A protein has these predicted regions:
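A recurrent flexible, glycine/aromatic-enriched loop bordering the glycosyltransferase active site
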Residues: 131, 135-140, 146-169, 188, ...
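Active-site-adjacent helix/loop segment of glycosyltransferases
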Residues: 205-293
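Conserved donor NDP-sugar-binding/catalytic core segment of glycosyltransferases
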Residues: 87-127, 133-134
Length: 315
């Protein structure tokens, strides 16, 4: 069984095309929809015959995915955003690639191309080929905004974007912390990078499969930060620090210190001046410092890969 997890929150405008792509997959899948208290027609569009978990409030992306994982039957789990469209062979090609790569590969992504509009109209621009990190602790989608070039082969990447990610169930079970696969403290945004980093620490790898193609409408990017809702920016600030506090070892922290400190000072200056709506992020981090450190201790205790082995991914 292959499980497809779809988290909705006022996603009606994208759902018809997204659901059509899932229905056209060349391999049978079970679809699990978790709705975070949508006020639009999302659930009506999903319709009958689909397992739906209805939340009375918006519990956040991470918690919603964990809810779906608790009932999913698949040995493979595809996480799909409502604003994504899968080509028919997407799931089948990713599974075949992971099977060939071996158990050390816990996650895979196809080539995500940029899409636009409610109808998820296709373009030839890259949206994501995976996740990469810089020495400043920032993470980006590999090749985002570049022109698509055919003829690529499968290759290893640091991690995969949660927009259209395939995970082995065995990988998700192995990296869970206190029963949570996706850390619910993240609520939304950067949780896929957190899972990717944790997976690396626990000895797993990730695969980019260019022959598996999907399309994704990218709505949250650094370029549009100033027009995003304040709550989005608040979670983004909170999670950029939470990501490192949990996963970064002392060697990487020392190696990357000049770059991270520069970036942190810029972010803090912005929060204290032009983006004061994100101040609650800093308060949250302080208030929850003991829980954060408890998670850090558990992750660092269970890690099997050293910072020195991971350092080449941060560049």
């Amino acid at each position: 069984v292959i499980s497809v997890v779809l988290v909705t929150w006022n996603s009606a405008r994208y759902l018809p095309r997204c659901l059509a792509g899932i229905a056209l997959q060349t391999i049978a899948v079970e679809l699990i929809v978790v709705d975070n208290a949508s006020s639009d027609d999302s659930l009506e569009i999903v319709g009958d015959g689909v397992r739906v978990i209805r939340n009375a409030t918006n519990r956040g992306f991470s918690a919603a995915v964990n809810q779906a994982l608790a009932v999913a039957r698949g040995q493979y789990i595809l996480l799909c955003n409502p604003d994504a469209y899968l080509t028919p062979t997407y799931v089948q090609r990713l599974i075949a690639a992971l099977e060939a790569a071996g158990e050390s590969y816990g996650a895979a992504t196809g080539k995500l191309l940029r899409a636009t509009g409610d109808a998820i109209e296709r373009t030839d621009l890259i949206d994501s080929k995976g996740i990469r990190f810089t020495r400043s602790g920032r993470h980006f989608d590999v090749a985002q905004g570049e022109i698509n070039v055919p003829g690529e082969t499968n290759r290893e990447v640091f991690g995969v974007s949660g927009a259209c990610a395939l995970y082995r169930r065995s990988f998700l079970n192995a990296v869970a912390i206190d029963g949570e696969v996706f850390d619910e403290d993240f609520f939304a945004y950067r949780e896929d990078a957190d899972l990717a980093w944790r997976g690396r620490l626990f000895g797993f790898r990730a695969l980019y499969v260019p022959d598996a193609v999907a399309y994704h409408v990218r709505t949250v990017t650094p370029e549009v930060r100033r027009v995003l809702a304040p709550v989005i920016n608040m979670h983004s600030v909170k999670n950029r620090f939470l990501l490192r506090l949990k996963n970064e070892g002392l060697y990487l922290a020392a190696r990357n210190a000049p770059f991270e400190l520069t970036r942190d000072l810029i972010a803090l200056a912005a929060v204290l001046t032009i983006e004061r709506s994100s101040l609650p992020a800093l308060a949250w981090l302080w208030k929850n410092r003991r829980r954060i450190m408890a998670k850090r201790r558990e992750i660092q205790r269970r890690r099997v890969v050293s910072d020195r082995e991971l350092a080449h991914w941060f560049r």
